Each structure stands twice: as C-alpha cells, then as structure tokens.
Amino acid sequence: MVQENKNFATAQAKSIRVSSRKLNLVAAFIRNMKVSEALVQLTFSPKRIAKVVKDCLQSAVANAENNLGLDIDRLVITKAIVGKALVMKRVMPRAKGRATRINKFFSNLYITVTEKEDN
C-alpha cells in the first residue's frame, strides 16, 4: 500500500442556526481564496454568519499547522461545503384560532484548506 502525502486539513461546524442558502453566500465568497485574505474578508463582512465561518476556518488552519505541520502562509481554501441539517418546527398562533408552522433551519459547514506550491 502506498502512503499518500496528506497536504490538506479539514474542519467542520455542525448545527449552525442559519439557513443553508444564507450560509452558502459566505462560503461561496471565500472558496479558492488564500486563508489570510479570507480571514480579513470575514472579519469585516456585514453578514451575521461570517463570525461562525471565520471560527471554522481558524480551526482548519490550526489543524493544518499543529497536526500536519503545513505552512499557514501558503494555505488556500479548496472546499467550503454547506449542507442542510435539522429543521426545528414551531407553531405561531394566528387570528381566529388558527396556527401556522414556522421552520427554523440549521446547516452544516465543512472547510478544507490545502497547501499550495508558490509559482
């Protein structure tokens, strides 16, 4: 069996209290971006969920540095995958004794950072 050289690290954030559509706006923005640039963009982003994405990205960078010994200056975000998680269903009372259902969506986020060669 051939031992493959692992030059990527991952991190995940599960059950984030935001819809996957809103989370994917931020995830698509940072895909294929250098980690240093993505951290700056997430710090000053007006989106509420950007703080959670930044924490997940910092976790992936820490995994790359501590577990694999990768150079953090050459890390690039290769994957930022957003998935649906559970849906909390709530009831909202309405007029004339009726009620409607409110769905509160949750999402999962998976980030992969890879060390790229300088060219």
Swiss-Prot record:
Keywords: Ribonucleoprotein, Ribosomal protein, RNA-binding, rRNA-binding. It comes from the Bacteria. InterPro entries: Ribosomal_uL22 (IPR001063), Ribosomal_uL22_bac/chlpt-type (IPR005727), Ribosomal_uL22_bac/org-type (IPR047867), Ribosomal_uL22_CS (IPR018260), Ribosomal_uL22_sf (IPR036394). One of its GO terms (cellular component) is cytosolic large ribosomal subunit. Gene3D superfamilies: Ribosomal protein L22/L17. Disulfide bonds: none annotated. One of its GO terms (biological process) is translation. GO terms for molecular function: rRNA binding; structural constituent of ribosome. Belongs to the universal ribosomal protein uL22 family. Part of the 50S ribosomal subunit. This protein binds specifically to 23S rRNA; its binding is stimulated by other ribosomal proteins, e.g. L4, L17, and L20. It is important during the early stages of 50S assembly. It makes multiple contacts with different domains of the 23S rRNA in the assembled 50S subunit and ribosome. This is Large ribosomal subunit protein uL22.
